[in-house]
Structure formats: C-alpha cells, structure tokens
Regions:
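Short beta-strand elements
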Residues: 744-754
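Bacterial Sec-dependent N-terminal signal peptides
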Residues: 1-26
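Acidic/proline-rich low-complexity IDRs
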Residues: 2-5, 9, 506, 582, ...
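Glycoside hydrolase catalytic-domain context in secreted enzymes
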Residues: 17-719, 726-742
Length: 754
C-alpha cells in the first residue's frame, strides 16, 4: 500500500512541472513575469484598442487614472507629497472624502531635509514615505520638489531643497531611491523654472542656456540619471513661450532626448493648455485640467481633457497618427509594471513608531543653530527653574495649510508641549505668553487642526504680558516666524515682504531687552529679515518639521541632541542682496495692461542675474549676508585641517581626491559637515568665485578624529558652453577650498587640469 502511494506521489510530481510549464506558456506575454518588460509592453500595446490607449493617459478622478480592466491592469492612484500622504478628496472635487483612515506621519519639509546635508536622511525619508503611501493604496507620490531658491519671497520654497544645484542633486537621489524601493513612483517637480508662485500660470521665464543648465536643471538631471525617477511633473510656467507641461525644449529635447528619460511626464493639475502641444511636446499623462467643462459639481468631465476624447477624435479624423500615442502608452505601461503590476511590492505601514522616529531623526539633523552668543544654548536643565515660552508658533499646528502639501495627522507635538514634557522631567516650570496673534483659522481644504486660537487682546497687551513674564524667567524661548497661510509659506502666492509678519520684530526687541537669555526660534521654510540679530543671544532655524516638531526642537534646545544642520540657502539681510531683486527682475513685466486680470496676459520674467544665485551673487557683489550658505553651529567644536590631494595634476578623464582631518575638539559628541568648493583660477568665461562640488557629514565623539576624502572628476570643473551647447572643462589652474560654511573656507589646495 505504501509502495502504491509513493508511486502516485512520484507520478504527480513528475507531471506537475510539465503542467506548470504548460500554464506558463499559455500566459499572454504581457502577463509573463519571465519575459523582459519591454517585450511585455509591446504585447500589451498590440492588444489594446484606441479607446483603451486613450483612457490610461488622462485622469478619471482628481487623483487617479484608469487601468485596463479587460487586460487586468488596475487603476493608478497618485497623491500629493512630498512631506506626507495627503488626505483623500472626493472623486471629482477638492473637498475631503471624509475618511477616517487617511491620516499620515508628517515628515519635515524638504528645506529641513536639505539642511541635514546628509543623504542617508533622504533615503530614510523616502523609504518611510513609501511605506505610508503603500498602506494608503497610492502608486505615485507627487514629489519631491527641487526648484531652486531664487528669491526668499517664493511661497513654496519650504517644499524645495535650497539654492545650490549640487546640494539639491545629491539630496534628491536617495529620496527617490528610497521611495521607489517600495514600489511607489516618485514624481519630481516642478520641471522646470517654477521659482516663484504669484503668477505661476502666466510667467514666461527668460533665462540663458548656461543658467538653465548650471543652476536650474542639475537636480532634475540627477533625479533622472542617478535617481532613475519614474515620474516627472511639468511646471505651470512658460519657457520660450510654451507651457512647461508640454514644452518641446524642456521635455522632448532635454528630458527625453538628452537625458534619455524613460518614465512618464505628468501635467501639474491644470497645467495642460493646448491639444497639439500636449500630443507632440512630451506630455504623457494629463491631470487636473479645470478647463473644458470640469467645474464644481460636474461629473464625467474628464472626457473633455485634451488627452481624452479631443485627442481620440483627432486621431480618428487623421490629424494625428498613433505614433505619439503609442509612446505615451509605452511609458504609462512601463510605470504600471514598476508599480501596480509589480508582484514584489512590499506591505505598507501607516503611522508606525518607526516612521515617527524617522521624522524626528531627520528633524534633529536638519535644525540649524544660527547664533549662540555666550553659549546660551543648550538650556542647562540642572540650573534652570523657570522657562517662558512665547509666540503663536509655539502652539500652532503647522501640518495643516501651505497648499497641496497640507496633511491630516494623528499626532503633531507642538513646540510648547515638547518643551513642557522634556523640561518637566527635570522639574522645570514652563510658562507661556502668546506675544502676537497671526492666523487663527487652523484649517485648510476641509482639514482642521481643532485649535481655537482666537485672542482679542491688543498688540500692546500681548507684548506687555510677555515682557512682564520674561523679566522673572531664567530663559525666554520665542517661537516666531511664518506660517502656512496665503502670502507666507504657502502654494499659489508669494510673500509680500521680507520682514516678519504680525509686528514680531517689536516683540523680539522687547523680549531681548527684558531677558539676556533670550532665544529666538524661527519657524519657516524661508529666510526673514533680522534687524535685531545683534541684540539676541540665540537664534535657531526650526523649519516646518511635522509630527515630531515639539520633540525634536526640545531635544535640540536642551542638548539631548546636538544641532548639526547647515543652511541650504544664503540668509540675506535684505531682498536687495539677491540678484532677482537687486536687478528688479522679480516678478517680471506684463506684456499687456491690466496685469493678471487681462485674459491671456503673460508676464515675462528675465533672470538677469544669470548663474549668480544665492552665494554666487553675494560673493560676486562682496555682500556679507546675515548667515552664509552652509552655516550652522554645534554645541561642540571641530577642527578641519591638513588638506591634501592624491595628485597635483588631473587628466581630463581622471579624478582627484582631497582629504582633510576632522577632529571633535569639544566635550560633546556631534557632527560636522566638510564642504568642498572649487574656484576656477583662469577661465575664458565669467565664473562664480566658488561652487560647491562635494560635502560629507561625519559624526565624532569628543576627542575623536577622522580623515574625510572627497573625490571629484572634470564634471566638477565644467561650465555649460553656450556656443557648443555642451559642458566644457578647460585646462588650467583650479583651487579646492575646504571648510564648514561658504564664508568659512580656511583651507586651500591648488591643482591643475590638463
């Protein structure tokens, strides 16, 4: 009997592989995971009808596009980032869907991530965000943003990675890799030249090819060539009089031609304006168009999108062939195979403790200690008995607002609560005074903070209360700055002024006079004017840092964590210290009278400062800013010494490695960022005095030292040559400048390229 059973088992075992092989052979190629993806795409395209091709290249709801049910391709779902997964909205409109499971962890804004100067933080950020997106059923996160910080008035700077193209290029790549390692597509935005918000739909940017390639494109190029991003979002603005969501130069020539990009180009919501340009100039997926019938309460208006029925009818009428359509479909199917049709996507997690820990770690590494006179920080918790906290930003929830990056969170710890919890452990009394009243609404697009911030007291009474309490406190910590309301750090508008709103300057001066241990914490994604800087003991740049805001800030202020952030932009004294404002090119010149109220009017904005953005401009004009690019202090001290190189002459196809010794000479563990800049001593064209071309963050215990090496190739020495439309590295003399900030480069090493 046992022998009979064994024979049966062996017979079945022998048959099973044959049946499995037969089943595999019977699978259509587009479903056969053993086949190359491009072959599967070819097979899928051959099976699709014209209508099926059209249906996958435009939206079917606010944030989704249709799949191909007949062939087993599911719908594709996007959602806003880049700091967390946006709460779900209604199918056709922007109102909240009213779900109870669409909260998220709010991660620090990307200015804070960039300020960490730590690519490892970018990887952690991307992975955690990808896991949250997976749990929420999202296939693409609309981010990260890498538009360059050209003016501190840009309302959306907080979503970007600063002024320097090299820093942004290094920081964006691990974010993309981390996110896409979870099977969720990045959608790097806003490509390109979307450097201010106020007239973003009407701005036609006039910029030299050199500035375009040296300043505004490198981070996008890195996202494509090194990050291998699967998605790129076009920008609202125009370049060479064509909107960037369907622009023959930026999309067809540069992105898909020069960079060989194989992913999809997604329109920004409402960024498509023309059928023929949408077909021929590189747009692959159209989302959010509010023209052609999509108005409040309308349904099924997606058929009116340019890449929907108008496109299909034009093909049927012979106006277009299916050549362009098949390229769009190929790219979308490639995206499907990377995401929705990827059987190896992991499981997602939502609001896990590991994600909160990641958010806190990123925040702590990105917070910047700007000024620390007389070592006023960290707070000595063994000697202090009473701390006064001042300012609306100490209690205001900052995850709500700011535009499309607004989030709904399960938890957000305010700075006041964070300090109460931390200082309470040492028996320290924490008092609070409002100081000023700003935006008390606490809601955005149907998501509310649940806070009641109404306060009818006069400015004089608010300041008087704060000053009176400050006189008897051991420390005064004010949380001020901006918020995410219109005309501050918010999408759709730019700031009206460089100065702090709500008369905060007056409050700061009064508090600094009342208490010598006064620390100002600036909560913003932008620089602000600081006319009172010399009167203030401590200044901290606190950013918008999300769910763990209070915990992270309390850790930095008390010394539980040692600040190591560095500024990702130059903190100027006034707007006139930036090229865009010094040359009066912002926000541009209207072509017709009537400005934005004139239908079809365009505003031309010429980037006359050319390549001289940020520290490149202040160097050129010999301006000493409030705080330099790359500036950031620590509670310990470091020495950077013994700069040497592995050679004195570098070949065109070679590399050169620079090495320095970094030592923690203080009494606390901490981290320092070694920054390498290159100076072209003799060039045939005008070049900046220096440009960042390498950096490395190193964590050291007290007394510990390490050698840090940075290797560069001729790419770091090149400029964009407009005559040949190519990058050029000229033979000659160069200098490597090394230090810990753009204004603190004490080491120099000469070398030659031949």
């Amino acid at each position: 009997m046992k022998q009979f059973i064994l024979s049966c088992v062996l017979s079945v075992a022998a048959i099973a592989p044959s049946q499995a092989q037969q089943t595999t052979r019977q699978l259509p190629v587009y479903l056969d995971q053993t086949k190359p993806v491009e072959q599967r795409i070819d097979d899928a395209i051959s099976r699709m009808t014209l209508a099926e091709k059209i249906r996958i290249i435009h939206a079917q709801s606010k944030f989704s596009s249709a799949g191909i049910p007949r062939l087993g391709f599911p719908d594709f779902w996007t959602d806003d980032g880049p700091h967390g997964v946006r709460p779900d909205v209604l199918w056709d409109e922007w109102e909240q869907a009213g779900q109870t499971n669409d909260s998220c962890v709010a991660f620090p804004a990307l200015t804070c991530l960039a300020a960490s100067w730590n690519p490892q933080m970018s990887r952690i950020y991307g992975e955690a965000l990808g896991e949250e997106a997976l749990y929420r059923g999202k296939d693409m996160i609309l981010g990260p943003g890498v538009n360059i910080y050209r003016t501190p008035l840009n309302g959306r700077n907080f979503e970007y990675m600063g002024e320097d193209p090299f820093l942004a290029s290094i920081m964006v790549v691990p974010y993309i890799q981390g996110l896409q390692s979870k099977g969720v597509s990045a959608c790097v935005k806003h490509y390109c030249l979307n450097n201010d918000e106020e007239y973003r739909h009407q701005v036609n940017v006039i910029v030299s090819d050199r500035a375009l390639h040296e300043i505004y494109l490198p981070a996008f190029k890195a996202a494509v060539e090194k990050g291998k991003t699967w998605g790129i979002m076009g920008a609202y603005n125009l370049y060479k009089n064509e909107h960037n969501c369907h622009n023959q130069w930026t999309l067809n020539k540069i992105l898909k031609g020069d960079w060989k990009y194989d992913g999809v180009v997604v329109s920004d919501w409402g960024g498509a304006h023309d059928l023929e340009q949408s077909v021929k100039n590189g747009l692959d997926m159209e989302f959010g168009t509010w023209t052609d019938g999509l108005t409040m309460g309308a349904t099924n208006a997606y058929d009116n999108y340019y890449l929907s029925m108008p496109y299909m009818k034009a093909i049927q009428a012979g106006k277009f062939t299916q050549k362009e359509l098949d390229d769009k479909v190929r790219r979308v199917l490639r995206l499907f195979y990377r995401t929705t049709m990827n059987p190896n996507r992991p499981h997602g997690f939502l609001c896990s403790e590991s994600h909160y820990a990641a958010a806190r770690q990123i925040a702590e590494e990105g917070i910047v200690l700007l000024q620390n006179r007389n070592n006023v920080l960290p707070i000595n918790t063994q000697k202090v008995k009473r701390v006064l906290v001042v300012g609306e930003n100490a209690i205001k929830m900052m995850t709500v607002g700011g535009g499309s990056s607004s989030l709904k969170v399960q938890r957000e710890i305010s700075p006041l609560d964070g300090l109460k919890t931390r200082l309470g452990k040492d028996g320290i009394e924490v008092d609070y005074a409002r100081g000023y009243v700003g935006d008390v609404t606490g809601n955005y697009n149907g998501v509310t903070t649940g806070q009641n911030l109404e306060d009818k007291r006069s400015e004089a009474k608010l300041i008087a209360e704060a000053v009176e309490k400050a006189k008897t406190a051991d420390y005064v910590i004010m949380f001020g700055g901006l918020n995410k309301s219109d005309f501050q750090d918010c999408e759709g508008h730019d700031r009206k002024h460089y100065e702090l709103p709500y008369h905060q300057d007056k409050l700061i001066e009064a508090l600094a006079k009342a208490n010598r241990n006064f620390v100002y914490v600036n909560i913003s994604g932008n620089a602000v004017a600081m006319p009172w800087k010399a009167k203030v003991a401590g200044i901290v740049q606190g950013w918008f840092i999300g769910s763990e805001s209070g915990e992270a800030l309390a850790s930095i202020l008390t010394g539980d964590a040692n600040p190591s952030g560095k500024l990702p932009f130059t903190w100027v004294n006034s707007l006139k210290e930036t090229g865009a404002h010094a040359l009066n090119t912002y926000p541009g010149t209207w072509r017709q009278k009537g400005g934005a109220s004139t239908k079809g009017n365009i505003i031309d904005e010429e980037y006359k400062e050319d390549i001289y953005v940020g520290y490149r401009w202040t160097d050129k004009e010999r301006i000493k800013p409030t705080f330099a690019f790359g500036h950031g202090l620590s509670y310990t001290q470091f020495s950077i010494s013994n700069l040497r190189s592995d050679k004195m002459q570098m070949k065109q196809d070679g590399t050169i490695t620079f090495t320095v010794n970094v030592k923690n000479t203080g009494k606390r563990a901490g981290a320092e960022t070694v920054q390498l800049y290159i100076h072209d001593v003799e060039a045939s064209v005008d070049r900046p005095q220096k440009e960042l071309k390498g950096f490395q963050k190193v964590h050291l215990q007290p007394g510990e030292s390490k050698d840090i090496s940075i290797t560069i190739s001729k790419e770091a020495l090149s400029f964009y040559d407009e005559a040949s439309s190519s990058w050029k590295a000229e033979a000659g003399k160069f200098e490597a400048l090394v230090g810990n900030a753009a204004d603190n480069l004490k080491l120099k090493k000469a070398f030659e390229l031949f």
